[in-house]
Amino acid sequence: MKFFCQFGGLLSAILLSSTLATAQPAPVKTAAKAVFTLTTFKADGSLLSSSHGVFIDANGTAISDWSSFDGASSAVVVDATGKKMNVTCIVGANEIYDVAKFIVDGKTASAPVATSGLAEGSTAYLLGYAVKKAEITEARIDKVEQFMDKYSYYIIKQEMPGNTQSCPLVNVAGQVIGFLQHSQYTTDNHATDALYVAEMTTSGLSANDPVLRRTGIPTAIPDDEQQAKLALMIAGQGADSLKASKVINLFMQKFPDLPDGYYLLAQNAMIGNDFDMASKQMETAIKKATAKDDAHFTYAKLIYQKEVYKSDIPYPAWSLDKAYEEAQKAYEAEPLPFYQHLQAQILYTKKEYQQAYDLFMALTKTNLRNPELFYEAAQSKKMLNAPQTEILTLLDSAMSVLPQPLTTEAAPYLIARARQLEEMGEYRKAIADYNRYDTLMVGRHNAEFFYQREQCEVKGKLFQQALNDINLATRMAPQEPLYHAEKSSLLLRLNMKQEALEAAETSLSLDPEYSEAYLLKGVAQIQLGNKKEGLLNLEKAQQLGNEQAPALIEKYK
């Protein structure tokens, strides 16, 4: 009788288990087909991590944990049918919640994401991974915490089956509410709201996200064209060339009729001096582009860059004339002023300064009017040996079109005008511009700036300010012999003979063949009463080719 009761109890348990297995809602079973395994690899091809995840649409969009991607160079998934697919890009990630959204290269079975969360005490279903029949486990939601006002963070206290990290949890309708995360500190299991991960998007600046930068898998290209171009630009500036090439390919897949991706490929080819490949890329861009003006303009920029920075490497198919021709084609297709701006820059580079000046000035009467045009016109006038006052007037115009109050945008134009005023002998006015530049760029100067301003201050007889600046220059660039020699020269003017001698000796310690430093040391020694040693140093300066030395030797001997 006892045996019968035990057998009966066991039979009831088996029947109950069978009932639970068969009682699972059909949408839950369907959702199990969207589960996959995720495997990530290091740059050397070795295994980094294994996990799971779930597809949330039919186009390969998936969610899983972020930690599997941290430090990964590549990743693959295997779906519930055994099909392997590559992870092409990351859409978003959050290190704190350890979640990531990404895309694979294929069509996929999917489970929809729940738009509303579950309450405490509700039942969820944990979907395991299997090629044939997935294990499905009921899970009680023990606690729900809210974050960011609208998302749920679930806590599940019951023990879960092994090898279910990042497997999805769904509601009775088969909608994904989150995926399983084991606690590092307790026996609890957690799940971050799948809606939070699903709503992640990319922008042009996503590639600069410090979390996403830790993976070699590229960031997804935004749907917005301008944001996509920004993402492409940032990728092109990055140090990871392999990751950048992946971003370029993603951009070209999403925007095949835009020239930007081809331009970056062409630019990379040009950097490697493969001008044939660069040319082919741009010819392809022109053929495919719907906006022909943009494609021709991009090609013109590329040729111009080559002719400016790599003119020593011959490539007969390209020339400044070819660059001008492509810019002209762009303008004919769409008469935009900045296409003519490039033409003006090309004319300047060709030393056709009058034509360049005329075009720069014509552009100041368009909606492109900006300080750069007046500055470039001033440079053209300078090359034409125009009166100094005409050049200054153009630089004044550059300053006048800048927005007020001045920002760092004004910095290059202030420096240009300061140098022009200095060249004209208007030292106090020049110093005023140097000072305004100093105020705008506070904390971002280099030693060269303080040296330049010191030179102007000496000419303007502002010796104390000059001494302050040359001291700053020597502190910022202590290994530059020129600055110590200049300091020595200024100290001699101020009759600070011993300090001048020490500065000259510092300069010589950095460059033992610096004739100017020998000259200054010699003068300082003579003024300190050491005529013999001083003359020897003047003679050394003469031997090194210093042109001032002979007259000083004659003066002091």
What are these regions (language model features)?
Residues D57-L127, K132-I136, K150-Y153:
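Conserved active-site neighborhood of the chymotrypsin/trypsin-like protease fold
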Residues Q24, F41-D65, K84-N86, S166-C167:
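A conserved glycine-rich beta-strand in the N-terminal activation segment of trypsin-fold
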Residues Q24-P27, A109-Y153, M160-T164, L180-A191:
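Flexible, gly/ser-rich surface segments that form the specificity/activation loops bordering the active-site cleft
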Residues L264, T298, L342, E376, ...:
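Canonical tetratricopeptide repeat
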Residues P25-V28, G178-K243:
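C-terminal cap/linker of serine protease catalytic domains
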Residues I271, Q305-Y309, T349, M383-L384, ...:
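Register position in tetratricopeptide repeats
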Residues P259-D260, A291-F297, P335-Q340, N370-E372, ...:
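Helix-start (N-cap) detector for alpha-helical repeat units in TPR-like alpha-solenoids
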